[in-house]
């Protein structure tokens, strides 16, 4: 009769050992907040468009005048701006007010700028349509410039389609591009900055945002779509 209690004791001991063997170790404390799939699915209310959709929206329309900002819109030109800061005002933005910097930037330093793929597609599309293309930049004007030739070569613009770059400059409290867009009767204007979009909207042109590359020297990055404008997908490069 004593064998049954002993057998039961052995069973309980075995079960307790098994439970101990499979007991979960305490989880380590999380290092970061992490993310769940619902958070990943959240998107900002931005009107995304592709180059093909822009082209389709212009179908049936006669040739128009279109405009492009330069820096961070058609060219990744941070190498020149970075060089200018290092050479003329290390750690500061004062170089942007130095005529010597602009002389160099507008006369050769764009040899180190990279043409953006989105700009190649856009310009090719507008050339095919027969549109007039203008480049309107906030860079300071210099006595000479090679930017026009650089853009012509980078984007394969025929000689009879080339318009000299418009150097609108930068003036405090004033959007210097607005009057130029009006004077050239530009109907579509592409740009990466808020000023580009608001300049277009102020003259009833269609402002379309090109994404500024995250490694651009021009900080902070703007909030694309903040003015209800169209934003081109995959346009950061």
UniProtKB/Swiss-Prot annotation:
Enzyme class name: hydrolase
A Gene Ontology cellular-component term: outer membrane-bounded periplasmic space
Any one Gene Ontology molecular-function term assigned to this protein's record: acid phosphatase activity
SUPFAM superfamilies attached to this UniProt entry: HAD-like
Binding-site residues for substrate, renumbered to this chain: 137-138, 177
Cofactor note: Binds 1 Mg(2+) ion per subunit.
Cofactor: Mg(2+)
Subcellular location: Periplasm
Family recorded in the similarity comment: Belongs to the class B bacterial acid phosphatase family.
NCBIfam families on file: AphA (TIGR01672)
Protein name: Class B acid phosphatase
Organism, scientific name: Rahnella sp. (strain Y9602)
Lineage: Bacteria, Pseudomonadati, Pseudomonadota, Gammaproteobacteria, Enterobacterales
